[in-house]
Amino acid sequence: MVDYVIQDWQGQTAGNITVELRVAKEESAAAIVHRALIRQLANARQGTHASKTRSEVRGGGRKPWKQKGTGRARAGSIRSPLWRGGGVIFGPKPRDYSVKMNRKERRLALRTALISRSADLVVVQEFADQISRPKTRDVAEALTRWGVEPGVKVLLITADRDQNVELSVRNLPNVKLITATNLNIFDLLNADRIVSTSAALEKIQEVYGG
């Protein structure tokens, strides 16, 4: 159980919220979060890398010169791996890098990662109604009022998508905007500071609570 102070758009205290999420035991927390992170990064790989073997490279069917009598080294194909333009030995081939992990474990890792970042988490009121039109400066100034240092990597979590918020945030190079349902291990661990709306935290408890 963790208690957070909720800040309004101006950075003033507007209430409190309690987050209750079941997390992994201390001795296994790092391991399960690490497994979930490795899974996410592995599953993001396309695995479409490919190289051609000597049998797949175009040409090379004819013996370049006779076996004996030329004084040159023996050669059976111009596509030998020893030749320029030849095939590749043990080169990369398309493969599936995906890693399986039980859903219960994935959610446990996500909850554990979120609670582990409690000291870096700032909770604010829903602010979409404060942005009547896309304005990057408004969001940048709000982050400063909420105590977020300039230049640090920020993960901004909202309950739902809002076009004005998205357009205002996308010009801030160090800020990543996601919704509560798109919460993931990498973004949680990669950010220096996490800013979440109170509604987003409630949705996280509803979706991932256990």
From Swiss-Prot:
User: Which keywords does this Swiss-Prot/TrEMBL entry list?
Assistant: Ribonucleoprotein, Ribosomal protein, RNA-binding, rRNA-binding
**Which GO terms are recorded in the biological process aspect for this UniProt protein?**
translation
User: Gene3D superfamilies recorded for this chain?
Assistant: 3.40.1370.10
- What residues form the membrane-spanning segments? none
Q: Name one GO cellular component term.
A: ribonucleoprotein complex
Where do the segments described as Disordered lie?
43-80
Task: Give this protein's Gene Ontology molecular function annotations.
Answer: rRNA binding; structural constituent of ribosome
Mark out the compositionally biased spans (Basic residues).
Answer: 60-71
> What is the purpose of this protein?
One of the primary rRNA binding proteins, this protein initially binds near the 5'-end of the 23S rRNA. It is important during the early stages of 50S assembly. It makes multiple contacts with different domains of the 23S rRNA in the assembled 50S subunit and ribosome. Forms part of the polypeptide exit tunnel.
Q: Assembly and partners?
A: Part of the 50S ribosomal subunit.
HAMAP family attached to this UniProt entry: Ribosomal_uL4_B
Q: Which family, according to UniProt?
A: Belongs to the universal ribosomal protein uL4 family.
Q: What is this protein called?
A: Large ribosomal subunit protein uL4
Query: What's the source species for this entry?
Result: Synechococcus elongatus (strain ATCC 33912 / PCC 7942 / FACHB-805) (Anacystis nidulans R2)
Q: What is the lineage of its organism?
A: Bacteria, Bacillati, Cyanobacteriota, Cyanophyceae, Synechococcales
